[in-house]
UniProtKB/Swiss-Prot annotation:
It catalyses: a uridine in RNA = a pseudouridine in RNA. Residues 40-74 are annotated as: Disordered. Its main location: mitochondrion. It comes from the Eukaryota. It is an enzyme of class 5 (isomerase). Gene3D superfamilies: Pseudouridine synthase. InterPro entries: PsdUridine_synth_cat_dom_sf, PsdUridine_synth_RsuA/RluA, RluA_PseudoU_synthase. Signal peptide: none annotated. This is RNA pseudouridine synthase 3, mitochondrial. The keyword Mitochondrion applies.
Length: 475
C-alpha cells in the first residue's frame, strides 16, 4: 500500500510546475578537475531536470449547453488544439505557441480515458503528442511545457463558461445595455474600448460572436457587422439584422455610389450618410480645418507576421488605396493636445490614425503604434500652453470632485482617444417589408417614417475625464 502511494505521488509531482525534491540519501563525492588542472572534491553536477508540464482545463465542448433564449440549438463548433492553447496563453506570442507544436512538445489527455495506477507511473502511456490542427473533443486536456509561458501566465478561465463556448448571462446583459437603437432592419450600439471586432475560436468575447449570440432577439440568425472599429477605439457600431439590410448598408459604407439604386428617395438618403469621430491629438494641425487626401498602403513586417498602414508613395506602384478625411480643430491647445473632429469620406483600415499621425503630424493620444516617438517627447518635454486668441499662458486645474480615470490624458499610459460619436444613415427599415422585400420609394405603410436616422454616442469614461480636465483651465 505504501509503495502504491509513492508511485501516485511521483506522477502528481511530474505534472506540477515545481521541481521534484532532492533524494534523501547523501550524494556521492566525486573528483573534479578545473581549468588550472587542480583536483577538487565536490558533489556531482546536477543532471537534466524532468520536463515540467502545464495542464490546461479540460475542453468543455460547444453542444452540451442549453441554447440561448430565442436561438436554436447550434451544432458543435470545430476548435483546433492551437486555438485552444492560444486562448489561455493570450500574452504569449503566437509564433512561440506554434513552435512548440512544430517541435512535438504538446500532449493531449482525455479525462474519461481509464488509466490504472501502474500506468500513471509512465506518462508516455496516456499522454500522446498532438498536432496544431487536431480537433478538440469534449473532456480532452492539453499539457505543454511550462517554458512556453516564459513568465507569468495570464489565465482567462473566467471568460469561458463551464459547459459552453457561448457568452454567459452577464455578458449578454452587458451587451444589451449597450444597444441604443433597434428596429426590424438594423441594430446600433455604443462599443466600449478594448473589445475586439472579430475573434477566432475559441475566443468568444469579440463583437461579432457576442452580438450573434446575445442580440438575435428571436431571429434565427444573429446580426452581422456592417463596418468595423479598431479594438482600442469606441463609439457607434452598426449591425444588419437581415441579409438585405446588411448587404445594402455594407455597400453604403464601402461607397455611396455603390449603394445607389433607381430610387431618388433612397439615393438622397445615401448622399446624407455621414460619420463623425472625436479625437484628442498631440499638438495642433497647421490649418484649423481641411481635407486630407492621402492614399494608404499596407506593408508587412517581421516576415509577414505583422502589418502596418503607411502613406502610399506618390508613384502609386505599391498598391495604394484612396483615402480621404475631412477634419476640423474644435478648440485651443491644452496640455500640448487638441480636440479635433474627423469625418472619414472613405473607409480604409487605420485611416484616421495614419492621417492624423503622418499627414497632419499630430498622432492621436494613446496611439502607440503610429505615434510612439511623439508620445515619448510629449511626456518627457512638457510645454506651456497658450490661449490662441490672447497669447496669454494658462495652466490646467482639476475640477472639484473629478476623479482621474485610468487612461485619461493625465495618465502615465493614456488609452486611445478616438471615438465614433455621430452617425447619419438611411432609415433602411422604411424600404424593407416584413418578409425582406425591397421597396424603392419606401413601403406604403411607412410614409410617415423619416428617411434618415441620426445617432450620437457618449464618450467612454477615460475620454470624458480628459474632456472635463482640458475644458477647465485658468487664463
Amino acid at each position: 500500500m505504501l509503495c502504491r502511494r509513492r508511485r501516485v505521488g511521483a506522477a502528481v509531482r511530474w505534472l506540477s510546475r515545481l521541481a521534484p525534491p532532492a533524494p534523501a540519501e547523501a550524494d556521492p563525492v566525486v573528483v573534479r578537475v578545473d581549468g588550472s588542472n587542480v583536483a577538487r572534491l565536490g558533489k556531482p553536477k546536477p543532471g537534466p531536470r524532468p520536463r515540467q508540464l502545464l495542464s490546461l482545463p479540460p475542453f468543455p465542448g460547444g453542444g452540451d449547453g442549453d441554447p440561448l433564449p430565442g436561438r436554436k440549438a447550434a451544432a458543435p463548433r470545430r476548435v483546433t488544439a492551437v486555438s485552444w492553447v492560444k486562448h489561455y496563453l493570450a500574452d504569449v506570442p503566437q509564433e512561440v505557441v506554434q513552435a512548440h507544436f512544430n517541435k512535438r512538445l504538446v500532449y493531449s489527455e482525455c479525462s474519461d480515458h481509464e488509466v490504472s495506477v501502474e500506468t500513471i507511473k509512465s506518462q508516455k502511456h496516456h499522454l500522446k503528442k498532438i498536432k496544431h490542427n487536431d480537433v478538440m473533443e469534449p473532456g480532452m486536456r492539453i499539457h505543454l511545457p511550462v517554458s512556453v509561458a516564459e513568465g507569468e501566465i495570464k489565465k482567462r478561465y473566467e471568460t469561458i463558461p463551464t459547459a459552453t463556448l457561448h457568452p454567459n448571462k452577464d455578458e449578454i446583459e452587458y451587451l444589451r445595455r449597450l444597444v441604443i437603437h433597434k428596429d426590424s432592419a438594423i441594430l446600433v450600439l455604443n462599443k466600449p474600448p478594448k473589445v475586439p471586432m472579430k475573434g477566432n475560436l475559441p475566443v468568444h468575447n469579440s463583437m461579432d460572436v457576442l452580438a450573434a449570440a446575445a442580440l438575435s432577439y428571436g431571429n434565427e440568425e444573429g446580426p452581422k457587422l456592417v463596418h468595423r472599429l479598431d479594438r482600442e477605439s469606441s463609439g457607434l457600431l452598426l449591425f444588419g439584422r437581415t441579409k438585405e439590410s446588411f448587404t445594402r448598408l455594407h455597400w453604403l459604407f464601402t461607397s455611396v455610389n455603390l449603394a445607389k439604386t433607381n430610387s431618388q428617395v433612397w439615393n438622397a438618403a445615401c448622399e446624407a450618410y455621414m460619420q463623425r469621430y472625436w479625437a484628442l491629438v498631440i499638438g495642433t494641425p497647421k490649418e484649423r480645418e481641411g481635407i486630407i487626401s492621402a492614399p494608404l498602403s499596407k506593408v508587412l513586417l517581421d516576415d509577414g507576421k505583422a502589418e502596418r498602414v503607411i502613406l502610399a508613395h506618390p508613384s502609386g506602384i505599391d498598391g495604394a488605396q484612396e483615402a480621404v478625411t475631412a477634419y476640423r480643430v474644435m478648440g485651443p491647445t491644452i496640455h500640448g493636445c487638441s480636440w479635433i473632429e474627423l469625418r472619414p469620406l472613405t473607409g480604409r483600415k487605420h485611416q484616421l490614425r495614419v492621417h492624423c499621425a503622418e499627414a497632419l503630424g499630430t498622432p492621436i493620444v494613446g496611439d502607440y503604434k503610429y505615434g510612439w516617438f511623439v508620445h515619448q517627447r510629449w511626456k518627457q518635454n512638457p510645454q506651456p500652453d497658450f490661449e490662441p486668441f490672447t497669447g496669454e499662458p494658462y495652466k490646467l486645474r482639476r475640477p472639484e470632485g473629478l476623479e482621474i480615470q485610468k487612461g485619461s490624458v493625465l495618465s502615465k499610459v493614456p488609452l486611445l482617444h478616438l471615438h465614433c460619436r455621430e452617425m447619419v444613415i438611411p432609415n433602411i427599415a422604411k424600404f424593407l417589408s416584413s418578409n425582406g422585400e425591397w421597396h424603392e420609394n419606401g413601403a406604403p405603410w411607412s410614409k410617415e417614417k423619416p428617411n434618415l436616422l441620426r445617432f450620437i454616442a457618449p464618450m467612454p469614461a477615460h475620454m470624458k475625464i480628459s474632456w472635463n480636465i482640458m475644458s477647465s483651465y485658468l487664463v
